[in-house]
């Protein structure tokens, strides 16, 4: 019996950076909820971006945002996992040294960049992802007390190669550095992640792990796979993820997750 479903967004429910989702997801998720099954989007996106994507049903969802560093509902923040304050300045400064990298820092209610409003990063986050984002001269001018994530962006899809000097350094023992797609390296607290947030949600809802499913397509989803009763991915996912998953659905282009949700709906009892 399945009582809780969580899913990554980009590369799993929608193509990377898509500003909208197949509206049939709203219908199927609502039908699952009517049978007592809870749905939780789980993404590297900000809460504001996720809320926009799921606007017609957002008031009925849990949200795991910013790569597992904040768990909330529409009404209330339930938990946050901020980056240790002493790491933020040196981490940003290291990111600035890397060729072609733009730095972005993420707080619970706002995101900050320093690339200019005509820069590729700002335009992507503002126009496509619908972030509440502000361009400022220096992201280090923002208070450090609730920084959830430091993100490094490379517009030419070479994030792993460009950031290798950072990921191979001592920084790997201070923060988690997770690749999300081919443009992003997400730096979060060591005790943060999608898996940690998904596990806490299960605890708060008193739902055992074996009654959960998690859908994801990238390396930042691996921690959530280990916290799920069943792990699922799409055929367009990275090979490492396909090998780790219990279920491989059709590609994101062919709404593989939507098909799996319909299968779950078909076999679910009328109400849990």
Residue ranges and their predicted role:
Residues 94, 100-215, 219-224:
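Conserved acidic, metal-coordinating active-site core of Asp-based
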Residues 3-18, 225:
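Asp-based phosphoryl-transfer active-site loop
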Residues 1-4, 22, 186-272:
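Mg2+-dependent phosphoryl-transfer enzymes with acidic/Ser/Thr/Gly-rich catalytic loops
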Residues 20-122:
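Active-site phosphate-binding/coordination module
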Residues 56-59, 67, 171-173, 227-228, ...:
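Short, structured coil segments at secondary-structure junctions
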Residues 13, 79, 248-249:
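A structural signal for hydrophobic residues in beta-strands of small regulatory alpha/beta folds
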């Amino acid at each position: 019996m399945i009582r809780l479903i969580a899913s990554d967004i980009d590369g799993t429910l929608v193509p990377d950076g898509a500003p909208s989702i197949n509206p049939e997801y709203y219908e199927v998720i609502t039908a699952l909820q009517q049978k007592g099954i809870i749905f939780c989007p789980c993404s590297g996106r900000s809460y504001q971006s996720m809320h926009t994507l799921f606007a017609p049903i957002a008031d009925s969802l849990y949200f795991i945002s910013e790569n597992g560093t904040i768990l909330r509902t529409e009404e209330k923040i339930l938990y946050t996992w901020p980056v240790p304050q002493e790491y933020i300045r040196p981490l940003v400064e290291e990111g600035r040294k890397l060729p072609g990298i733009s730095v972005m820092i993420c707080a619970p209610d706002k995101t900050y960049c320093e690339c200019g409003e005509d820069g590729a990063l700002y335009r992507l986050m503002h126009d496509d992802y619908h972030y509440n984002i502000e361009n400022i001269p220096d992201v280090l001018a923002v208070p450090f007390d609730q920084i959830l994530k430091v993100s490094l962006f490379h517009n030419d899809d070479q994030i792993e190669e460009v950031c290798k000097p950072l990921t191979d350094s001592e920084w790997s023992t201070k923060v988690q550095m997770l690749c999300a797609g081919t443009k992003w390296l997400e730096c979060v607290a060591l005790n943060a992640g999608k898996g940690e947030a998904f596990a806490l949600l299960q605890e708060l809802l008193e739902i055992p792990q074996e009654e959960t499913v998690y859908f994801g397509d990238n390396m930042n989803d691996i921690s959530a796979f280990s916290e799920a009763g069943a792990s699922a991915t799409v055929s367009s996912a990275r090979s490492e993820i396909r090998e780790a998953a219990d279920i491989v659905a059709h590609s994101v282009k062919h709404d593989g997750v939507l098909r799996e949700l319909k299968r779950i709906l078909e076999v679910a009892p009328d109400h849990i």
